[in-house]
Amino acid sequence: MTAFIPPYPKRHEKEINPFQALYYARNDLLSMWDEDAFKMDFMSQKILKQHVFIANSPDIIRYVMVENKDNYERKSPQMKRALEPLLGDGLFISDGKTWASRRRIQTPMFDNAHIQMYSKTISSTIVEMADNWQAKGNDTIIEVHTEMAKLAAEIIARTLFGEKLGAENSEAVVSAFADYQSVVKQMALSNFLGLPDWMPNVNAKIGKAKRAGQTIHNAVDAIIALAEKGGHEGTMVDELIKANQSESGIDLMTRKQIRNEIIVLFMAGHETTANVLAWTWYLISQSPDVEKKLHQELDEVLNGRVPEYSDIENLKYTRAILDETMRLYPPVPILSRQALKEDEIRGKKIPAGSLMLVVPWLIQRHQKHWENPDHFIPERFMPGEKKPKKFTYLPFSAGPRVCIGKSFGITESVLAVATIAQRFRLELPAEAEVKHECRLTLRPKGKLPMIMKIRS
């Protein structure tokens, strides 16, 4: 079996200087790395007046994300400014006591019992989409990334707000998110470099972000108002409102803060999953042996029935495909933190205010930690294989700030791949050229058309 090597940005033969880095990063933050970046443990660069450090070994990543987490807890000020118009002080960008309180309130919503409850909505939404595909007929061209985005948005909307409210409002909210994402894309370089907010170009983009964020706020506020009228028991918004009640009867969060957390859940719950699923179908389409093994597993475990939550533990190869997809295409390819106080790592002084980057794109393709790191080999994640060294695989981040929705995302993705792959094959047209786009998340660039084949 010859493993597929998906295309990736050209790597520079030697380290590029700060001005070259700026040039390449204008359009793609993943095109600025040289070959040595996939071999080295710790790197530093001074870009303009900003000190930038890259933690690129398991021990340093552990130090930054766990052992000295309090010093590297905070997102960069510029990243906060980019996301605050949308998320306010939501879980994704808060820190300190605010973050700890929000995390504590929401953690029970993502325990196994709740995920199993949500899985019924997840499964029915996937089946509904698959039925719509079936009705289109064999050899229909499916724009896969758009379809996966719609699916993930429907799932999180229905899980958050209930079947009726979610179905009626997901499209409007997703459209508003797309507008916001286009602004964030323009801000990616300034966020990464920590350019000051007073710079005209940066300031103008922050203004655009605020206007786009307000559109989303209005849409979500309207949905919450309807949800509060009752009849939405078992939804995430209902669980969040209940969890917000303290024993003394005093609300732990304001209405505005609840809205912020709902937006965080919606944003994190549809964007990353949609991207992972789109990349998964692309990789499967280029790997006939992988597809054959996937179909064999689905036939053996499911025998044509719709997968349920209890099946997930037996869909080991399906899960391995997703794990390998997230290794090659990490949902969030660059994690940025700010050093609050001066520090020292491996003899290098880390000035207060420096950017400390943990880059899943690098560590998950690092030549010290992965054999054939650029190859698509799901078998490396199968039971019995050597497990990846801790802190070399970070699709959901790591440490105390590991993604709260990790189990939800895995459940959703496994059920989606199992349900869809049982009924369809997706073929990439010969003329199609697949490229990536690095925003806050890593997604296919432009459209991803695939030919839908109904399995007999």
Ranges and model annotations:
Residues 19-41, 218, 222, 305-346:
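Conserved cytochrome P450 K-helix E-x-x-R motif and the immediately C-terminal K′/meander segment
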Residues 1-52, 59, 63, 69, ...:
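N-terminal targeting/anchor module and adjacent flexible "hinge" preceding the catalytic domain
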Residues 358-386:
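Conserved cytochrome P450 K-helix/beta-meander segment immediately N-terminal to the heme-binding cysteine loop
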Residues 30, 37, 126, 130, ...:
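Cytochrome P450 proximal C-terminal region
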Residues 58-59, 361:
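Alpha-helix/helix-capping structural signal
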Residues 272-297, 407-424:
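Cytochrome P450 catalytic-core helices
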Residues 2-10, 32, 72-80, 98, ...:
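Cytochrome P450 heme-thiolate monooxygenase catalytic core
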